[in-house]
Amino acid sequence: MDVNPTLLFLKVPAQNAISTTFPYTGDPPYSHGTGTGYTMDTVNRTHQYSEKGKWTTNTETGAPQLNPIDGPLPEDNEPSGYAQTDCVLEAMAFLEESHPGIFENSCLETMEVIQQTRVDKLTQGRQTYDWTLNRNQPAATALANTIEVFRSNGMTANESGRLIDFLKDVIESMDKEEMEITTHFQRKRRVRDNMTKKMVTQRTIGKKKQRLNKRSYLIRALTLNTMTKDAERGKLKRRAIATPGMQIRGFVYFVETLARSICEKLEQSGLPVGGNEKKAKLANVVRKMMTNSQDTELSFTITGDNTKWNENQNPRMFLAMITYITRNQPEWFRNVLSIAPIMFSNKMARLGKGYMFESKSMKLRTQIPAEMLASIDLKYFNESTRKKIEKIRPLLIDGTVSLSPGMMMGMFNMLSTVLGVSILNLGQKKYTKTTYWWDGLQSSDDFALIVNAPNHEGIQAGVDRFYRTCKLVGINMSKKKSYINRTGTFEFTSFFYRYGFVANFSMELPSFGVSGINESADMSIGVTVIKNNMINNDLGPATAQMALQLFIKDYRYTYRCHRGDTQIQTRRSFELKKLWEQTRSKAGLLVSDGGPNLYNIRNLHIPEVCLKWELMDEDYQGRLCNPLNPFVSHKEIESVNNAVVMPAHGPAKSMEYDAVATTHSWIPKRNRSILNTSQRGILEDEQMYQKCCNLFEKFFPSSSYRRPVGISSMVEAMVSRARIDARIDFESGRIKKEEFAEIMKICSTIEELRRQK
């Protein structure tokens, strides 16, 4: 029979139909090749927005720099970065007037954080520009390399010290006349293979010492490496994002700590909270505006969009904000916080890998590295690239570009939110001194503006005033992309509001399904996603039950673990059938071992092993939870793991799921091909680092881990801990006298070896 599709919506309120408009099936686009072109675009655009500023030259690096601050007031609607210092300071003063003590309290909180933060905070985070090797590395490795270089150059760096002490070293390093670093390089030799008697290329990794003079070191310390942002939907062109080096990261972290603390106290800020908490916060602002718009008043909301938020922001403006916010604070604190914006005012952008050329006729490919762009003949490039390179040439130094204005993506999200909120704050009647007034929401570059006024002219005047006020601090509301509606319907950070926030369940669709980590984690993540969507996204019981059945089906097809009594033939079915037949209690078999599914929407919170434990045969229990099983190298798992789930929009989210370690929690082995590349030395360093950390965690279980252990080294801390634990175990009779003596002997030997070293 034919179903009329409109019948589906008869009983559904219009706002719930949003989940049917989901456009993002299929994979998002990824970038290939180099990001050099995108980075040049960013640099050229940023300079264009600030072109009427003043040019100066950095005395240390010789880099030309453009300063648009206090530049000409705008005469048209073109985006521009000419923020006026006095306007920004005044906005800050009014923000403080509306929230007495907010800056003072946030400064106190931040000082406390600065005193307590350990340098290992910087190991969090993904790719980081490693200035010693001049390319990207995992954060932990980049930090270890930096500390190693600092130490060999006579600084006091310490892996377990405070972050503030590491930052003192960074400052000191900038005053040094030269820095000695160790770089990796590759040697290739042609040798004859004994077995096959063929000639093969053998690669060896060499480490060599290199001296950087002050200028070269400063350029590297101020460099942000660039890459292309991947998986961005709904865009025709890719764009560049920045990864800063270790010198900048620590300073940025403290500035963002201060700004986060301020944002937490501002009701208009969409950061740093998320999820339901964010929705509640935002709903409050809307409610306030709607209740206050008496029957005589009109209320309109703009779903706002800003033009090139980052490229029109300016680090010098952030410096002014910080100077004001910390004005009554101790000198050291003000200095620490002002370094990040100063470094950003002098930043250099690395152009990435450069361009790839290929000649179709001669079947040749060659890479033109970014360093060569300053001197290469431009006749080889097409029209648009030629224009880009010409524009950028005056700014080039050693393959990096001087980029003083602009902020690069994702660097000061919290602080720029504070700036945005300070303009929303000026919408109160006591500041507008007229019949219209405004309020709104701000989250990084995204905003929603609610304007109330007695008539349409008032609304228009309010919007105009907001627009112009923003211009004065370098915020450019896009008139083309912003949309105005009667209050009650708008969008903010992909939340859709219609008389309350609408659960847009379809946004979570990409995270349903089998993650592909391993059988154990995938089962756990799959049911947790369904559980979370029932809690947060209006996923109803019937739909959830269906989602669960689809997930189990998907899971069985992925791991070829159909029920033991099924007719489906796969590579595993022979083994699974055998297991099924010799198992007394078939309900106890995990789904991944061909067992039945016992999940329903009431027990999604229980890990499968726990759900079925009582139903399992004893020998099956023994095989399943056997840490000595030689066929499985599985990790030791804390009770909670983190999975990365991909919603359709916005960044990948981290989601906790329960992890029970079984022989199904295997880890796939690392691809061997890396061992023949220049990465090998780094891989060995990384494994060393990993081993040390794992060992340390064995001595200091998670409760005491990451607590300051004085300034003793990791080894000293572990030895003293081992002695204490051994004594306690010996006195309580858990270990014998011989064992106790042996432990003490090992400890002494370790100390002796350290002394000799």
From Swiss-Prot:
Record-level Gene Ontology MF annotations: nucleotide binding; RNA binding; RNA-directed RNA polymerase activity
Cell compartment(s), UniProt: Host nucleus; Host cytoplasm
Post-translational modification: Phosphorylated by host PRKCA.
Organism: Influenza A virus (strain A/Singapore/1/1957 H2N2)
Self-association state and partner proteins as the record states: Influenza RNA polymerase is composed of three subunits: PB1, PB2 and PA. Interacts (via N-terminus) with PA (via C-terminus). Interacts (via C-terminus) with PB2 (via N-terminus); this interaction is essential for transcription initiation.
Origin: domain of life: Viruses
Function recorded in the entry: RNA-dependent RNA polymerase which is responsible for replication and transcription of virus RNA segments. The transcription of viral mRNAs occurs by a unique mechanism called cap-snatching. 5' methylated caps of cellular mRNAs are cleaved after 10-13 nucleotides by PA. In turn, these short capped RNAs are used as primers by PB1 for transcription of viral mRNAs. During virus replication, PB1 initiates RNA synthesis and copy vRNA into complementary RNA (cRNA) which in turn serves as a template for the production of more vRNAs.
One GO BP annotation of this record: viral RNA genome replication
Comp. bias intervals (Polar residues): 55-64
Region (Promoter-binding site): 249-256
Keyword terms of this UniProt record: Eukaryotic host gene expression shutoff by virus, Eukaryotic host transcription shutoff by virus, Host cytoplasm, Host gene expression shutoff by virus, Host nucleus, Host-virus interaction, Inhibition of host RNA polymerase II by virus, Nucleotide-binding, Nucleotidyltransferase, Phosphoprotein, RNA-directed RNA polymerase, Transferase, Viral RNA replication, Viral transcription
Sequence segments annotated as region (Disordered): 50-82
A family per Pfam: Flu_PB1
Transmembrane segments: none
Protein family: Belongs to the influenza viruses polymerase PB1 family.
Catalysed reactions listed for this entry: RNA(n) + a ribonucleoside 5'-triphosphate = RNA(n+1) + diphosphate
UniProt KW Ribonucleoprotein keyword: no
Protein name: RNA-directed RNA polymerase catalytic subunit
Residue intervals of the RdRp catalytic domain: 286-483
GO CC terms of this entry: host cell cytoplasm; host cell nucleus
Entry keyword annotation includes Plastid: no
